[in-house]
C-alpha cells in the first residue's frame, strides 16, 4: 500500500537474499542503504532520528500484520479463517460493521483458499445469519458467531 516498506526486515537481519516483488499498481521504489541509516550522522540531526523512528514503527506494524495473518491462516477450515478475519476486522473497527480492505478475490488469496469455495462458504454463513455482506461492506452478527 501507499507508504509501504518491503525488504526492511531482510536488511536488518543481514540477509544477503534476493527476492521477487510484483506491484499491483505503478509505484516508485526507493533503495535506502541500511548501514547508512543505522549509523548516526555527524550532526546527530533530528531528521535522522525521525527516519530511524519511522522505520522501527513501520517494521513493528509489518510484524503485527504478519502475526495477524499467521493467526488467521492457523485455522483449518474456510469458515474458521473467515470468522477469525472478520472478528479481527470488527475488533479493529470497534463495531460489528466494517469494510473489507480488498476484493473478495484478494480475500480468498489472503486466507489461502479457493475463491469459489470461499464464496460458497460466505453464502452458507449469510444463510445461517452469521454475516450480512454487500460487496465489501460486512456486518458480523457477533451473538451468532461466538
Region locations from a protein language model:
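Cyclic-nucleotide recognition modules
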Residues: 1-56
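Short helix-to-loop capping/linker segments positioned immediately adjacent to catalytic or ligand/cofactor-binding
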Residues: 18-19, 39-48, 65-74, 92-95
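A general alpha-helix detector
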Residues: 36, 65, 103-106
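An amphipathic alpha-helical interaction segment
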Residues: 54-64, 81-88
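Phosphate-/nucleic-acid-contacting segments
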Residues: 78-81, 87-146
Amino acid at each position: 500500500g501507499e507508504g509501504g516498506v518491503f525488504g526492511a526486515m531482510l536488511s536488518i537481519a543481514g540477509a544477503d537474499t534476493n527476492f521477487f516483488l510484483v506491484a499491483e499498481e505503478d509505484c516508485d521504489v526507493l533503495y535506502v542503504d541500511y548501514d547508512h541509516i543505522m549509523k548516526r550522522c555527524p550532526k546527530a540531526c533530528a531528521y535522522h532520528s525521525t527516519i530511524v523512528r519511522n522505520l522501527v514503527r513501520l517494521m513493528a506494524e509489518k510484524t503485527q500484520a504478519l502475526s495477524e495473518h499467521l493467526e488467521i491462516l492457523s485455522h483449518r477450515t474456510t469458515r474458521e479463517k473467515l470468522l477469525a478475519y472478520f472478528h479481527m476486522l470488527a475488533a479493529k473497527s470497534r463495531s460489528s460493521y466494517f469494510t473489507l480492505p480488498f476484493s473478495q478475490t484478494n480475500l480468498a488469496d489472503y486466507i489461502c483458499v479457493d475463491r469459489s469455495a470461499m464464496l460458497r462458504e460466505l453464502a452458507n454463513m449469510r444463510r445461517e445469519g452469521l454475516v450480512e455482506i454487500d460487496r465489501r461492506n460486512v456486518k458480523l452478527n457477533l451473538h451468532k458467531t461466538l
